[in-house]
Amino acid sequence: MKQEENGESGFGRLRGGARRAVRVSTQALVVTDSLEPGRTFPLVLRPAIEGLDLAAWAAANREEVERRLLEHGAILFRGFDVRAPAQFERFARSISPELLDYRERAAPRKEVGRGVYTSTEYPADQPIPLHHEMSYSHNWPTKLWFYCDQPAGWGGRTPVACDRAVWNLIDPRIKERFIEKKVMYVRNYGEGVDLPWQEVFQTEDRALVEEYCRRSRAEFEWRGADRLRTRQLRQAVATHPRTGDTVWFNHAHMFHVSNLDPLVRNSLLAEFKEDELPRNAFYGDGTRIETSVLDEIRRVYREASFAFDWQRGDVLMLDNFLASHGREPYAGPRKILVAMAELYTNAECNRED
């Protein structure tokens, strides 16, 4: 382990005793570590003293946490006494007081606290590919936190990837094509296969859905009694607002029909046209994205990824520009919670008039 090298002030709390402020160096409170020798992504922070209050320490050392996050892209807080969703929420708010609601959903989640949700409630036997949270939307969270309330009995690891590495691994010709054309997402709600529009937009009022679409520059079309189609032209890459890093930032490989299990894909294509599928991705001009190109993106993510086993009480903090995340299949109960903060607005996709 390597000791934290700079900073002062923090707060310690001994188990069984009253909380008290302690003026000590950060070195004495937290040490840096790694999940394997030589690996700095994600950075691992552990308490150097028993009973350290993570939320209080983070509040007192917020600038240092922010600096580390921008440097590494991901921080795993391990060994701290975080044992309940309320403690997790308190820690997240110590960094970003205003947590975000989950709107324009792509997956089912349940809210378990103010701004705290279950992670994607997707079938346990299916993997979730690496992705940036809400990169299909007109705005997205800058910061993410994942909290392990209960690790899976088997599997359920979370792969993460440093997107500085991902960007460097992608063929320049693919980058150029996507930068020029961008990505068009087509979603069809009300087919009984994917999420209903009422859950995605968190309302049953059509007028509110239409207003949301107009403001986010998304085309919409009501089809029949309770069906909705949206088309959204979105970015393929993004630039970090603080570091200036350019990163691959889209959901094309996840929304595209090639991401489906072959049996499911063939069944859907036998019933629907490609633009009538529950979700699909095209180039921004409406032309098909080559499956071979998306397979290359998936290969790059696999090459850049690193998966770790959860321990109860772990908190993983991600910069949503600099790190992507996924989920491996699992068996048995598993409870991972998520919080999001600091909304980034894509000016090209937001209408103020």
Enumerate the predicted regions with their spans.
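Active-site environment of non-heme Fe oxygenases that use a 2-His-1-carboxylate facial triad
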Residues: 2-57, 64, 68-71, 124-130, ...
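Short cationic amphipathic helices and targeting signals
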Residues: 74-79
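Glycine-rich loop at the start of a catalytic domain that most often binds anionic cofactors/ligands
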Residues: 82-97
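A gly/proline- and charged-residue-enriched helix-loop-helix capping module
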Residues: 100-132
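Long, mid-chain structured domain cores
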Residues: 135-137
